[in-house]
């Protein structure tokens, strides 16, 4: 008997979202995006790394904030998802009303934050100490929110005050409260997970979280969590400020694209090295192999 095909209700750069009545099913594909563009390559096992890594962190941090994960076992999902292509990379989730802010936290100065700091000594309106070098650890993690871009557009960094206004427009009377909670949850999550990662030989330089509201108006952690797609992971062994660091994430692919003037198809060698980095990070952090 054939199984009725289900079409996604939303396709993001990397994920597909399926309607499942009161819940959603989020499938992490093997697509890869850089600079807000979906590349032509498929990176085998990448979707499984993203889903299983998120599960690991969601389980670890539910004492700080509830999250949207219900199950990553396809047996808990409709029959359509009990195909091999969905096994390991699919997550049954609670429905949330997602808040329109990307919650970025930076523990080290790198990437776009470093570029802005070199110009004016600040990041997203936050004054930082003088004389920092690239990849330096910051005295305290900083919260630097951004807007959420549509596919093909770029996210825009905003100040904390702008995030209050942005949320107030969507949720009158709640802007300040929500903005403060997003900031506090983001920093608490980062601190707990960065401390843990360091014991496994990985520096989490920065990451982003996304949050939504449940049916009772409570803030819940959604989307993905501390994956190589949403974070910069550096090997702690050999960490040396003053320049960019080797990494366990898609920085490897980004660097190749920068050097090759946005040719949106990676050579197979770069694809293979990218998934090797993802798998290494997963194994170091979780102690498990995929």
Region roles according to the model:
Residues 119-122, 127-177, 221, 225-285:
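Anionic ligand-binding catalytic core segments
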Residues 1-150, 262-290:
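Active-site loop/lid in soluble adenylation, ligation, and acyl-transfer enzymes
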């Amino acid at each position: 008997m054939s199984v009725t095909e289900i079409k996604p209700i939303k396709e993001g750069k990397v994920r597909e979202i399926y309607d499942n009545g009161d819940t959603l099913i989020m499938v992490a594909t093997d697509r890869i995006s850089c600079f807000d563009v979906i590349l032509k390559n498929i990176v085998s096992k990448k979707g499984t790394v993203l889903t299983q890594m998120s599960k690991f962190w969601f389980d670890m941090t539910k004492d700080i904030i509830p999250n949207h994960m219900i199950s990553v076992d396809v047996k808990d999902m409709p029959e359509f998802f009990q195909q091999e292509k969905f096994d390991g990379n699919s997550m049954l989730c609670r429905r949330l009303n997602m808040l329109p802010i990307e919650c970025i936290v930076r523990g080290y100065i790198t990437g776009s934050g470093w570029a802005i700091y070199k110009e004016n000594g600040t990041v997203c309106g936050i004054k930082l100490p003088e004389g920092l070098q690239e990849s330096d650890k910051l005295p305290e993690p900083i919260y630097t929110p951004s807007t959420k871009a549509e596919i093909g557009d770029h996210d825009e960094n905003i100040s904390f005050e702008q995030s209050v206004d942005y949320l107030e427009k969507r949720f009158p009377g709640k802007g300040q409260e929500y903005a403060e909670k997003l900031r506090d949850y983001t920093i608490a999550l980062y601190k707990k997970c960065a401390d843990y990662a360091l014991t496994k030989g990985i520096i989490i330089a920065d990451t982003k979280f996304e949050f939504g509201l449940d049916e009772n108006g409570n803030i819940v952690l959604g989307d993905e969590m501390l994956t190589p797609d949403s974070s910069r992971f550096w090997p702690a062994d050999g960490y040396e400020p003053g320049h960019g660091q080797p990494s366990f994430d898609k920085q490897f692919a980004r660097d190749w694209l920068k050097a090759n003037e946005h040719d949106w198809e990676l050579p197979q060698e770069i694809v293979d090295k990218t998934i090797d980095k993802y798998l290494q990070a997963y194994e170091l952090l979780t102690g498990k192999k995929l």
